[in-house]
A protein has these predicted regions:
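Short hinge/gating elements
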Residues: 79-85, 127-131, 199-200, 219
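Extended mid-to-C-terminal alpha-helical interaction segments
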Residues: 177-257
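Hydrophobic alpha-helical core bundles mediating ligand binding, dimerization, or RNAP-core interactions
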Residues: 53, 142-145, 218
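N-terminal low-complexity or simple alpha-helical regulatory segments
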Residues: 1-122
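Short polybasic/polar patches that bind polyanions
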Residues: 17, 28, 58, 151-153, ...
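Surface-exposed, interaction-prone regions with an acidic/low-complexity signature
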Residues: 1-8, 14, 127-128, 134, ...
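Short, well-ordered alpha-helical segments
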Residues: 10, 92, 135-143, 208, ...
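DNA-contacting interfaces and partner/effector-binding or oligomerization modules
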Residues: 110, 114-201, 205
Length: 257
């Protein structure tokens, strides 16, 4: 069984609750419980998360649920991957860290960065194909990625294009409105293509000392057996990130930022 920290499922459950939509049928259908998703130290199977998002979209009668969740979610919910990016010096190095440490959040995905003269492409491939296309998950992930880059660079720019491996025949105009770039469906791979100039942008909150601490923790997570990682990483990670946030706030207060 492949494991995920289930940030997408937790954020989707929170979204349904805020909108007054009954999440229990989707939870039951995915083999999940509210108590599981209320605890950050419990991971779930990747297949269960995919299934929950698809069932939640059906319950909400919202074919764009993943995008709607991503538009409102706390970007930090993804955990250590967000903070690895936030403390990196440039977008290029932030994406390298995302690719290197992606399995700390989701064992089912392989992330790669391909660099060309005028553009760079981040691709995501699945270790194994799910029973049904995880459309909501990957659309949520796409908007999370774009919003995170905007926040961490304090710049608003559009990807050159985004591709999804799943098909979509409806609400295409709305998808483009959210992602603000050409989007192609039913492609060989899920990918985000950025101009090379974006790769060179600085991360406004770059912090080399904190990055070293975070990468050491992430390296430790990668070295653990998946079962151990599932049980323990969630317990250590929230405290580390809480300490990180408090330390950064104190630093800004003292330095007058």
């Amino acid at each position: 069984m492949l494991w995920t920290q289930a940030a997408a499922a937790r954020e989707t459950l929170s979204y349904l609750d805020r909108k007054g939509i009954d999440a229990e049928p989707a939870l039951l259908g995915a083999g999940l419980s509210r108590s599981q998703l209320s605890q950050d130290d419990i991971g779930v199977s990747v297949a269960s998360q995919y299934r929950f998002l698809e069932l939640a979209a059906a319950e909400a009668d919202d074919s764009l649920l993943g995008l709607h969740v991503a538009a409102e979610m706390d970007l930090r919910a993804i955990g250590i991957l967000f903070y690895l990016g936030e403390t990196s010096p440039t977008v290029s190095e932030a994406l390298d860290n995302l690719a290197r440490y992606s399995k700390t959040a989701n064992e089912a995905l392989v992330v790669a960065i391909l660099r060309h003269k005028d553009e760079a492409t981040m691709t995501i491939r699945r270790v194994q194909e799910p029973d049904e296309p995880p459309r909501q998950f990957f659309e949520l992930l796409a908007l999370w990625f774009v919003r995170t880059l905007h926040l961490q660079t304090n710049r608003h720019f559009n990807p050159l294009r985004i591709t999804f491996s799943h098909a979509r025949n409806s609400d295409l105009r709305e998808v483009h409105r959210f992602l603000r770039c050409p989007v192609d469906f039913a492609q060989a791979v899920d990918s985000w293509v950025l101009p090379q100039r974006v790769m060179d942008l600085p991360i406004v909150s770059e912090d080399s000392r904190l990055l070293r601490i975070l990468t050491a923790h992430a390296d430790d997570l990668l070295e653990r057996h998946p079962v151990v990682c599932q049980i323990t990483s969630g317990k250590a990670q929230p405290q580390l990130l809480e300490d990180f946030a408090e330390g950064r706030a104190l630093f800004r207060q003292v330095s007058g930022e």
